[in-house]
């Protein structure tokens, strides 16, 4: 018989803050746009669970992605649903704050013990939340998951070029 998969609950930042006092254990937070999600994202999320008891994944909102790379490929609701199905994820926080390209407000509100980053995010120059983590006493762990071999932007560019060739043959 196959094992039943329980999806992690998806909630707003305020909903998580409301239940935070009842959560016991060493809390780890990781974040990303996950648009589209790829094996590097999954490796970072799964590996993040090794740094604590409770894993919260903050999914950056559509404004963040629009500001970073244009129109999102997948909307926030869809990206949260996919992340909630990944093994080891305990909570998914849909995080949408316009005019902010960081998750500093989420870190301040959630107060995890650890903040993990994967890929090429390695120091204060590449992690805008670094100083806030130091201020709040949150340990930053870098290099989580696989090295930077996947890129959402590259995946989308390849997809676009294939579609272009399909409709506009040479």
Positions of predicted regions on the chain:
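Nucleotidyltransferase catalytic core that binds NTPs
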Residues: 1-170
């Amino acid at each position: 018989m196959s094992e039943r998969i329980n999806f992690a609950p998806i909630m707003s930042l305020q909903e998580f803050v409301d239940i935070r006092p009842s959560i016991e254990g060493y809390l780890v937070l990781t974040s990303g746009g996950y648009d589209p999600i790829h094996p590097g994202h999954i490796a970072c999320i799964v590996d993040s669970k090794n740094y604590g008891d409770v894993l919260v994944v903050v999914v950056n909102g559509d404004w963040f992605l629009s500001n970073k790379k244009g129109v999102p490929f997948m909307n926030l609701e869809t990206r949260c649903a996919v992340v909630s199905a990944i093994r080891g994820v305990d909570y998914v926080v849909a995080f949408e704050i316009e005019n902010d390209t960081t998750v500093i407000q989420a870190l301040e509100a959630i107060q995890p013990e650890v903040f993990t980053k994967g890929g090429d995010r390695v120091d204060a120059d590449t992690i805008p939340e670094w100083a806030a983590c130091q201020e709040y006493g949150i340990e930053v762990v870098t290099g989580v998951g696989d090295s930077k071999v996947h890129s959402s932007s590259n995946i989308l560019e390849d997809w676009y070029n294939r579609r272009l060739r399909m409709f506009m043959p040479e």
